[in-house]
Regions:
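Pyridoxal 5′-phosphate
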Residues: 1-249
């Protein structure tokens, strides 16, 4: 999260007293002191070893040291201020974009200033008539322009539900009634499960949003280029057809 590499490496800091009261309902390789098939039992390792499944990604660990040293050389305060300034400029520039009739081009989810936010901006694009532009259209055009964006639904379902004003009653109805029909086909392969239909039943006009992430390596040319890309949607209606189906969230 701090410098983007390596992936698949992380750590959890926990007190020994806290670990001692945790009991895992399963186990995997490298987490047991002993195990028996005929005895139908196992004895877990104590401490952190009992929670480290498999072989640690030791080949990538030196990169963590190098990355942290690099951050220390630059200074976290400097990095924070730089990303804050880039994020603020990008937010102001995007929110200033309007179609010829005054309709806003984008809707930003979350704070519209740098107060209380990080360097990630989630947004959606809208056509001049106020209709939401499919995030798959944005993704396709961005890829053709050499821009790397994350589109669709993200890791925080609660924030997504709040952004799209989905009520608890609607969500409970969908998951209690429709999921009973969808899930068996998903797990058995007896029938196709349409995520697009699921979204339609929720009343959602989109599969999620467009996410722009700024960080250590981001420079002004990057955010300026994205604003130029966003401007290509002004006063236009997307004509893309045959968008790929959404297989899942």
């Amino acid at each position: 999260k701090l410098f983007g590499y390596p992936t698949g490496v992380g750590c959890l800091l926990a007190r020994k007293t806290a670990l001692s009261v945790l009991h895992r309902p399963w186990f995997a390789g490298g987490t047991v002191w002993g195990i028996s098939v005929q005895g139908d039992g196992y004895i877990p390792l104590s401490g952190g070893e009992g929670f480290e499944d498999g072989t640690p990604n030791y080949l990538s660990l030196p990169a963590v040291t190098t990355g942290l040293n690099h951050l220390q050389t630059i200074g976290m305060d400097t990095i924070h201020e730089r990303v804050r300034c880039l994020t603020g400029w990008l937010l102001d520039s995007l929110l200033a974009l309007h179609h010829r009739d005054g309709t806003p081009l984008v809707e930003v989810y979350g704070p519209r200033s740098t107060r209380g936010r990080g360097g990630t901006i989630a947004l959606n694009f809208f056509a001049p008539d106020g209709s939401l532009i499919d995030e798959r259209v944005v993704d396709r055009r961005a890829s053709a322009s050499g821009l790397s964006l994350r589109t669709g639904c993200f890791c925080n379902p609660g924030a997504g539900e709040a952004a799209f004003h989905l009520s608890k009653e609607v969500l409970r109805k969908i998951f209690r009634e429709e999921a009973k029909e969808l899930l068996p086909g998903l797990f058995t392969g007896d029938g196709e499960v349409s995520w697009d239909q699921f979204l339609a039943d929720l009343g959602m006009r989109s599969g999620g949003a467009v996410r722009v992430s700024l960080g250590l390596a981001t420079n002004f040319a990057d955010v300026y280029r994205f604003v130029q890309f966003a401007q290509t949607f002004l006063d236009t209606f997307p004509t893309e057809r045959e968008l790929p189906p959404r297989p899942h969230c």
